[in-house]
Design a protein with these regions (language model features):
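Beta-strand-rich N-terminal accessory domains
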Residues: 30-83, 183-213
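Extended, loop-rich substrate-binding clefts of extracytoplasmic carbohydrate-active enzymes
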Residues: 84-143
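Acidic (Asp/Glu-rich), glycine- and aromatic
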Residues: 135-181, 371-381
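Beta-strand-rich recognition/accessory modules
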Residues: 207-284
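Ligand-binding face of N-terminal immunoglobulin V-set domains in extracellular IgSF glycoproteins
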Residues: 289-318, 322-326, 331-380
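Well-ordered alpha-helical scaffold segments within catalytic/enzyme domains
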Residues: 305, 367, 473-503, 520-527, ...
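Active-site lining segments of carbohydrate-active enzymes
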Residues: 453-459, 523, 530-601
């Protein structure tokens, strides 16, 4: 039954509908036009777009920190905007060299030229502020080289963790970002693959001469990423090419989600246009970040917190320190002045001194509506924070040993097939290389005996770096001598190559670690004649290994007389044994001498 409106009810209803509409859409607006700031990138509140402010480097290649990038509501969620040669480039795929970069603030345009020297292929990208986003146009002065047809395309990569459990619309067709990679792939012959750095290969094809090509999750002309999330909503559209959405994690766990359009063959001039809009929440400012010692403070030391602020934010006049009591209540113990420090790079900074608090207890800092986690103030605050480093971290890094902790085996005994002489005139990865001489009595790929003992893994990798060993040995000796450390929480048994964490064995752990690091360095000097740059796996598909260190090689010494992947009880035809890069330097000789002299004490 229809009920008549009372006087004024229609106006009230209309107002209510408008209020609901504007409340629902207040966080969804592509907002004002981007403009180039004094730092040379596009900016508006909530959105920064960088155009090759950072370049690809020749050490670790694609580190996801170069090309056209988007910092979206304080988080860098897009990177790698550039012409690339693969659907989902891996870290060691070829990277372009920046030839030129021109910033025209008056025209609100940034132009870059990049070149793949391996193919004598140069492209230009012109990035211009347009309406509420940016327009990217790709220009070619010469047609694509034939080898790059159906391979060269414009890519932009998006951080997976920012889009997990979110959705997309591709030409209005819905989909969702997968938590685990699950898109289609296909196999192609290796002769169709563009070579990676120095001819190395990230893919272990088991001798089949093939490689993987990921297929797209979706394809269309207009792609909306996370349209339901005002902080992550980005829309990308093209009028002259399809845009494909890929999952880079099919090839590497460090892969990102990728948008990509192929460049056309036999065409010059403007060959591709993208228009990108990143949603900007009106009035958005990055929340203050309070930086302090999470380990805590000694009562007598200076205590200063650093407060990092949005460039459009100004420091509050004061901050407070609250003490957490045993009954769960909190009491304000100090309210002090916040002093403006100034601007550095992207942020404003302020300092908050609370050195006057000397009473032991648990505290937190309150700045506006931001609150830190709890930290202690106590005379013994630093007395045991080093225990996890000696108890767990160092044992886990122990090479050539099985390492156990309670129910967990961190890794089996690895690299029992160490090591082969690195071949001359070889360019390796991770900075390793060999010149025209081995500077040893060993020939290229000849076995060097006695190196399967002692040492630690390098940070993040499973290679041995001798200079890092020397630094660690000197630090451990210094700590042992100054602080008389006798802590014993690690069981080490060399006859069985076994380490057990949290299990005392009656010996000083720090002395055991000094011994373990020294063993490998001494073996180098004994069997090679001098300390070496390092010992590392020969294949790139081994180097990015993320599993148990003992699975990076087969632990069987390489025998060139066996067929590839053929094994006996004591040898293998698989060329996976680590290589010793034996170039000699005066610096490393003296550094090692100092470390061994210290360890001998």
């Amino acid at each position: 039954m229809n009920m008549p409106f009372l006087p004024g009810e229609k106006k009230l209803l209309a107002f209510s509908v408008l209020l609901i509409f504007f409340s629902a859409t207040a966080k969804y607006t592509f907002g004002q036009t981007l403009s180039i700031n004094d730092s040379g990138y596009f900016e508006k509140p909530g959105v920064n777009i960088l155009v090759f402010n950072s370049q690809y480097n020749g050490m670790f290649f694609d580190e996801k920190t170069a090309g056209i990038e988007i910092i979206h509501h304080g988080d860098r969620t897009a990177t790698g905007g550039a012409v690339r040669l693969q659907n989902t480039p891996e870290q060691w795929d070829l990277i372009p060299k920046l030839v030129s970069r021109k910033v025209d603030k008056a025209a609100n345009t940034i132009e870059v030229a990049i070149k793949y020297e391996e193919f004598d292929f140069t492209s230009r990208a012109v990035v211009s502020a347009k309406e509420n986003g940016i327009e990217i146009t790709v220009w070619l002065d010469k047609p694509l080289p034939q080898k790059l047809e159906s391979k060269a395309g414009f890519n932009m990569e998006f951080l997976p963790s920012a889009y997990f459990e979110k959705t997309w619309l591709v030409d209005d067709k819905p989909g969702s970002f997968p938590l685990y990679p699950s898109s289609n792939t296909r196999i192609e012959s290796s002769d169709k693959k563009i070579s990676q750095f120095a001819g190395h290969n990230t893919f272990d094809d088991r001798g089949r001469g093939e490689f993987i090509i990921p297929g797209p999750l979706a394809t269309g002309r207009v792609i909306a990423l996370a349209p339901e999330d005002p902080e992550q909503f980005i829309r990308v559209q093209s009028t002259d090419a399809d845009i494909m959405l890929f999952d880079g994690r099919n090839l590497g766990q460090n892969g990102w989600f990728i948008l990509r359009s192929l460049l056309p063959s036999n065409k010059t001039g403007k060959v591709l246009t993208w228009f990108i809009e990143a949603n900007a929440i009106p009035g958005w400012k990055r929340k203050p970040v309070i930086e302090f010692s999470q380990a805590g403070y000694n009562p007598s030391q200076e205590k200063t917190a650093v407060i990092e602020l949005d460039k459009n934010d100004a420091p509050l006049k004061s901050a407070s320190v609250f003490r957490v009591m045993a009954d769960g209540k909190t009491v304000e113990r100090w309210k002090g002045e916040v002093k403006d420090w100034g601007r550095w790079l992207r942020y404003n900074y302020a300092k908050f001194d609370f050195s006057s608090i000397k009473e032991p207890g648990l505290y937190y800092i309150q700045y506006g509506d931001q609150k830190t986690n709890t930290f202690p103030i106590d005379t013994a605050v630093y007395s045991d924070i080093w225990h996890p480093t000696l108890d767990v971290w160092f044992p886990v890094q122990m090479d050539h040993m099985e390492v156990n902790e309670a129910y967990r085996v961190w890794h089996g005994a690895p690299f029992l097939d160490d090591a082969l002489q690195a071949p001359v005139n070889s360019v390796h990865f991770d900075g390793y290389s060999m010149g025209p001489s081995t500077q040893t009595k060993y020939k290229s790929l000849e076995r060097i005996p006695g190196l399967d003992v002692g040492g630690w893994f390098d940070a993040g990798d499973f290679d041995i770096q001798t200079a890092s060993h020397c630094t660690a040995l000197l630090s451990l000796v210094d700590a042992s001598e100054k602080f008389k450390i006798s802590r014993d929480e690690t069981f080490v048994d060399y006859p069985t190559r076994y380490v057990d964490i949290h299990r005392p064995d009656g010996k000083s752990d720090i002395l055991q670690q000094i011994q373990h690091g020294t063993l490998n360095v001494v073996a180098q000097v004994k069997f090679i004649g001098h300390p070496v740059r390092g010992i590392v796996v020969p294949n790139l598909h081994q180097y990015h290994h993320l599993g148990d260190a003992s699975d990076e090689t087969d632990n069987l010494p390489y025998d060139p007389n066996l067929k590839p992947f053929e094994k006996t009880s004591h040898s293998s035809g698989r060329m996976d044994d680590r290589w010793a890069f034996t170039g000699r330097t005066t610096f490393l000789d003296y550094f090692t001498t100092a470390a061994l002299a210290a360890a001998s004490r």
